[in-house]
Amino acid sequence: MFNNFLNMYMCTLAEKLCKFKKNNFNNIHRNNNFYRDNNFYRDNNFYRDNNFYRDNNFYRDNNLYTNNNLYRDNNFYRDNNFYRDNNFYRDNNLYTNNNLYRDNNLYTNNNLYRDNNFYNITLRKFHFIQTISNNNFNFEIIKKYGDVINKIMFIHTQKKNKQERFMFNNKKYIKRKEYILNDLNEFISIIPHPEINNEITNNSNQKKNKDNKQNVLSTNQQIITNYNLNHKENVTSNLNFNNKEEDEKKLDKLLKKRNIKKRDIVTITEEAKEELKKIISINKKENNNNYNNMNTICSDNHNDMNTICNDKNILKLFFITKGCNGLTHSFNFISKKDIHKEDEIIYDDQNNILLVIDKNCILYVINTTLDYYKDDLTEKFIFKNPNITSICPCGTSFHFSKKK
């Protein structure tokens, strides 16, 4: 009994399990279909949306492309029309301007031609001129206006009186006149008359004055050039003479400047000059005595005598370092060979060398006066040098400040 009950329970349990599995399978299948349907619907929507979006973009792009092309075509068409219209306008203006210019020229030429004819007709109408031949003119007039006289039309009239007369505008009779054409195509009487020729001559003179001014300038230039060419020799001779006079004046001035005595760097008083001459003469005597003595000693060897017996008779001024303040003036005898080219030389009245100043002392001795003092106790040379800045108490040495 228990077994039967157990089998029955197991069968029912098995049926329930089968139903449950079946339901689960159906649910799974149904769910799969639902998911698939949802995906399909969603995919369709996505595809449709994408197509719609793409179609919209394509439509928009096409519209943009067409609009751009249309805008470009419109611009091109507009530009072409504008360019064409401008060209047409310009061509029309050019055509109208050319026509206007041509018409104006034609109009002015016609007016000018008409006015000239009217002028000639009035002259013929109011001036009855007797026919004349070339023999009635002077030779000079025929020479100048021979070509023009042949072009003049003369009208012959006879009056009751045997005298030949001409009728004027105001119906007055005046004496016979002879007319010719001038360079400006105007009638001018050969015999001047104020009533006829004043107006014509005034107009012609105003036009000729401008030409005359230019001709006067050109003729003046030609006269000057011709004068210079014809009188070239006279002009050059005058210039050379003037140049010689100026050169002589310049030479005189230069010679006067050279003749002016150059001021020495050191001014020597008369007492100092006499004392320097005495010292130089004493030195020469001593040198001569020494020379005579050396002749007896150096008679056999002349080279030794020449080296020992050099003539040192020139007095030279220089500075030496001595004393408590630095420098002192000093003199020494040298020969002419020892004079340096940059040394300063002072001459006496007879152009003999009186004193030579060393090249290193020149800057410090400028404007110095050399004097000589002598009394019963002392005799000495005194230097009054403005360049010295300090002197020692004993007066033997001095000092210069450094120049900046």
Curated annotation (Swiss-Prot):
Is-annotated flag, keyword Nucleotidyltransferase? no
PROSITE patterns, per database record: HESB
Record keywords: 4Fe-4S, Coiled coil, Iron, Iron-sulfur, Metal-binding, Mitochondrion
Q: Please give the InterPro entries that the UniProt record associates with this protein.
A: Fe-S_cluster_asmbl/transfer, FeS_biogenesis, FeS_cluster_insertion, FeS_cluster_insertion_CS, HesB-like_dom_sf
Coiled-coil positions are: 244-289
Named from the GO MF annotations, one term is: 2 iron, 2 sulfur cluster binding
For this chain, the family text in UniProt reads: Belongs to the HesB/IscA family.
Job description of the protein: Participates in iron-sulfur cluster formation (ISC) pathway for iron-sulfur (Fe-S) cluster biogenesis. Can bind and transfer [4Fe-4S] clusters to target apo-proteins.
Q: What is this protein called?
A: Iron-sulfur assembly protein IscA2
Q: Which organism is it from?
A: Plasmodium falciparum (isolate 3D7)
